[in-house]
Amino acid sequence: MTAPVRDWNADAYHRVSGPQVAMAAAVLDRLRLRGDETVLDAGCGSGRVTRLLLERLPDGRVIAVDASPDMVARARQELAGDPRADVRRADLAELRLNEGEQVDAVFSNATFHWVPDHAALFARLAAALRRGGRLSAQCGGEGNVAAVHEAALAAAADAGLAARFEGWPRPWNFAGPEQTAQRLRRAGFGDVECWLQGWPVEPDEPRAYLETVCLGPHLERLDAGEHERFLDAVMARLGAHPVLDYVRLNIVARRGGSVDR
């Protein structure tokens, strides 16, 4: 199952994504890199975290992929001139590297929850990894920003826009650790560890952050002329300085034996 590609504002995301950069530090640490590996950055966004990954690979390289054309363009701009960075547009659920190409490790930050089919996702990542290769990832997990989305739907009612969200198939997949571990093992991973971690976020630019990071799918349900009314109602619900209830799903695993490519 392939999700429609979100129309991200990559420049805005690059500016407001400080919390995602902070979240990435421990995920990078868990890769335990030597510095000469080839690493897949699965969902590179605007390239801010890819640059941090490259700092750990003085003699290695990164294949950075993202489904969003705007994010890919911004990442190429961010990483221009670095021969270790290969930025490509790709849907992770349908990911296929070049013929005969595999990576030593997979890194991903704040991406997997945008992929509806995690079984397909993990199968494609396993196929991209060499045997024994390590996966270190973090994404939105079960309960992630639940209060934010509850406030957003209440705000839509406040703004007279509730009908736009009737029967809405929400586009994110905030999975739990147990089901994620099962899917990873079925895809050919071993040494699997998955756990949830609360991570409250107090963004520096709350309105811009919510508009860019959290509420993009909501805004796509509305006409352009309704966006500001909806955002006004959301901010009235959350307050001027909200603390957002992030819950992160941490994933560590190692690719086991042979898998179908």
Regions inferred by a protein language model and the residue ranges of each:
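A short SAM/SAH-binding and catalytic strip from SAM-dependent methyltransferases
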Residues: 105-118
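Class I SAM-dependent methyltransferase SAM/SAH-binding core
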Residues: 40-42, 46-95
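Short alpha-helix
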Residues: 172-187
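Conserved class I S-adenosyl-L-methionine
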Residues: 1-37, 48-52, 71-74, 134-159
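C-terminal helical/coil "lid" or tail adjacent to the Rossmann-like core of SAM-dependent
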Residues: 187, 191-242
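A short glycine-rich, Lys/Arg-flanked "PGG" loop and its adjoining helix->strand segment in the class I
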Residues: 119-134
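A short acidic, Gly/Pro-enriched loop at the edge of an enzyme's catalytic core
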Residues: 97-105
